[in-house]
Amino acid sequence: VYFKCRIGRIYNAMEKIEVIQEGAVTSCNIGVSKEEWLELLKDSATSKHYKEALIKVFYAPQHRGSCISICNKMGGNPQSLNSYITKCGEYVQKKLNRFQIIRPNGEPCYWLVPMAEGKDLPKNSEGTFEWQLRPELIEAIKEYLYWHLVECYKSLRKEIRIDDDKWNELYKWQLITECQDKDLISIVNKVRVTNLVYTPLVSPTLDFVINYRRKEFEKAVQSLADRQVLLDKRIQDFSTTMQEIADVPDNDKQNLYANDERTVSAILTCIDPNAYTTYKYGLYKSVCQYLNIQPKKAGKCYSHFMELIKPLLYIVENDKELHDLVAPSISNYVQSDLLLSQDILWVLFV
């Protein structure tokens, strides 16, 4: 069904959506799904300025703010942000070609396409008008940020291989391969001399418990690897046990018992590289910042990191181009999409 507008152009018949005004709040429902927003974000035809503008709002507290408050936090020009959001809304509306948002005066409204609502702010506020991103767009941006990491990683790996001499990350695959079918003590003995742990302090402590508290330590590692128990509880129990059995006599300067989450992650990864991957707090903190998520307290960071990596893992598992790209470097070693996911985060954030 078609109709002609006054200026003579022919358009597909589309829904006219009226703006809802409730006091100072302006809103409307446009029915654009998360999947549609994600497709638009991935589309190379969508201006990078539009994507950057949307992501700036995403990074604002609770994904809302005025142009001034957002730019004060993220940088940039408030007028440019306003312009890009408006132009983005116009672009999306034309791209989808199924609705028009109309103001009470009959004029089109474009900023409401990406925004769930907007409201006037009281005097002396940081700005005069506040936006709130649509929930479907928020979820799409979360997925897009993961997808974008994989795309950046593929571009990088086309130039620098995993086993490149100047930036060699192959040792991680070599380590998990060497640990296959080894007993727990042998695995820890290999882990303790790698940079996956804080070697100067952790390595001597692990060496001590292996040689002088072997039975107790082996039992502690067995409990740590028991997947029937929640990871946070296992880490807590391992930490407590290690403070008891790794207390080196006559060492009043000892302040690390090889029970930190980084050490735990390295041990677990080498025991089961398809269930765990390596962790470092600095990397975890950067990932949280990138995803606009608050880090957890000590003792819960590693389990949180493992949760945050799951969406990335799903993309990695289903990306044939990525696997074909890294295969020449790692095909002779134990395969772990979790380790590949960790490598993506490591090379892009550290």
What are these regions (language model features)?
Residues 58-62, 272-274:
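Short helix-capping/hinge SLiMs at alpha-helix to coil transitions
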Residues 107-147:
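Phospho-regulated, low-complexity intrinsically disordered regions of nuclear gene-regulatory
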Residues 23-43:
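Short, Lys/Arg-enriched N-terminal segment that forms or immediately precedes the first helix
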Residues 13, 142-257, 273-350:
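An N-terminal alpha-helical hairpin/helix-loop-helix interaction module that forms a charged
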Residues 64-72:
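Short acidic, hydrophobic short linear motifs in intrinsically disordered regions
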Residues 49-57:
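Short alpha-helical "packing" element that flanks the helix-turn-helix/winged-helix DNA-binding module
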Residues 70, 81-95:
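DNA major-groove recognition helices of helix-turn-helix
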